[in-house]
């Protein structure tokens, strides 16, 4: 039993929290902005738990969808489903249970939030299949990873104002930036199996594309800060995030696999910088 639970934990990447953090930071930015400061703590924990559950469900669905491809990729061939340690139906069952628990969390919230939760689940569940035909699936990932933004505004304000969609667009650019660096790690394997990724699509302009996406992300988040009238700590946070992006350039410019992966992981700190600036800006108002 314990061995089975360990395999399920690996399936949903409990040992690799970076994905949850990249999903969580935009949600937290939005919660603070929507509430004008710290949100109600009950709502805060609903969104934190929902983020963890939906990211875990997404990992299970992703492994199920990619099970015939992952065996040809060095980094993924030892995943529990790919290695034959669990069955395909088990991965689907785990994903379904996690998604249902996540949806149960939003049942006490307003109708708009519940409808957006359904949309978010559809986007998360269909993302793995976009890698079959969409040249930049990372953009779709950005929608999936950023959907906590409109949901946060909906839960707190019972509306989704334009600034929320602006932030969602910013998150799309951020996701393309960090996940292109991630895709650079697997590019050779993805070319062999015919998988679509932004790293392949951008080709020799991959590094330039990543930096342009960071610039677009920062510009759109700056616009959001202006619309919300945020004070100087927010701008310090954005400046620190820009510094993180500059550091990522030093890691990815030589296209070394391990350094590209390090750049991907370091985006946790970029998201944290934006959150810290946001939280302090509201705290001193």
UniProtKB/Swiss-Prot annotation:
Cofactor: Mg(2+)
Pfam family, one: UbiA
Keyword vocabulary terms for this entry: Cell inner membrane, Cell membrane, Magnesium, Membrane, Transferase, Transmembrane, Transmembrane helix, Ubiquinone biosynthesis
One of the GO BP terms on file: ubiquinone biosynthetic process
Location within or outside the cell: Cell inner membrane
Main enzyme class: transferase
Cellular component terms (Gene Ontology): plasma membrane
Chemical reaction(s) catalysed: all-trans-octaprenyl diphosphate + 4-hydroxybenzoate = 4-hydroxy-3-(all-trans-octaprenyl)benzoate + diphosphate
GO MF, one example: 4-hydroxybenzoate polyprenyltransferase activity
Main location: membrane
Spans through the membrane: 28-48, 86-106, 110-130, 133-153, 165-185, 210-230, 232-252, 262-284
Keyword Glycosyltransferase: no
EC numbers: 2.5.1.39
Pathways involved: Cofactor biosynthesis; ubiquinone biosynthesis
Membrane protein topology class: Multi-pass membrane protein
CDD domains, per the entry: PT_UbiA_COQ2
InterPro entries: HB_polyprenyltransferase-like, Prenyltransferase, UbiA_prenyltransferase, UbiA_prenylTrfase_CS, UbiA_sf
Function text: Catalyzes the prenylation of para-hydroxybenzoate (PHB) with an all-trans polyprenyl group. Mediates the second step in the final reaction sequence of ubiquinone-8 (UQ-8) biosynthesis, which is the condensation of the polyisoprenoid side chain with PHB, generating the first membrane-bound Q intermediate 3-octaprenyl-4-hydroxybenzoate.
Similarity section: Belongs to the UbiA prenyltransferase family.
Protein's name according to its UniProt entry: 4-hydroxybenzoate octaprenyltransferase
Species: Cupriavidus necator (strain ATCC 17699 / DSM 428 / KCTC 22496 / NCIMB 10442 / H16 / Stanier 337)
């Amino acid at each position: 039993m314990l061995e089975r639970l360990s395999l399920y934990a690996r399936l949903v990447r409990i040992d690799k929290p970076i994905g949850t953090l990249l999903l969580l930071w935009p949600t937290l930015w939005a919660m603070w902005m929507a509430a004008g400061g710290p949100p109600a703590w009950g709502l805060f924990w609903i969104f934190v738990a929902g983020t963890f559950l939906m990211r875990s469900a997404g990992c299970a669905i992703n492994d199920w969808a990619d099970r015939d491809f992952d065996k040809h990729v060095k980094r993924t061939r030892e995943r529990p489903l790919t290695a034959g340690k669990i069955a395909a139906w088990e991965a689907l069952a785990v994903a379904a249970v996690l998604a249902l628990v996540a949806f149960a969390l939003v049942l006490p919230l307003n109708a708009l939030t519940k409808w957006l939760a359904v949309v978010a689940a559809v986007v998360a569940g269909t993302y793995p299949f976009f890698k079959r035909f969409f040249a930049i699936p990372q953009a779709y990932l950005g929608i999936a990873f950023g959907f906590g933004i409109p949901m946060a505004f909906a839960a707190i304000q019972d509306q989704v104002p334009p600034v929320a969609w602006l932030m969602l667009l910013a998150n799309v650019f951020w996701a393309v930036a960090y996940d292109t660096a991630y895709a650079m790690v697997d590019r050779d394997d993805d070319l062999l199996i015919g998988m679509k990724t932004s790293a392949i699509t951008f080709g020799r302009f991959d590094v330039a594309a990543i930096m342009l996406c960071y610039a677009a992300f920062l510009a759109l988040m700056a616009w959001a800060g202006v619309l919300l009238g945020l004070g100087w700590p927010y701008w310090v946070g954005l400046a620190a995030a820009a510094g993180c992006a500059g550091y990522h350039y030093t890691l990815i410019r030589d296209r070394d696999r391990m350094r590209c992966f390090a750049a991907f992981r370091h985006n946790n700190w970029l998201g944290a910088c934006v959150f810290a600036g946001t939280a302090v800006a509201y705290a001193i108002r």
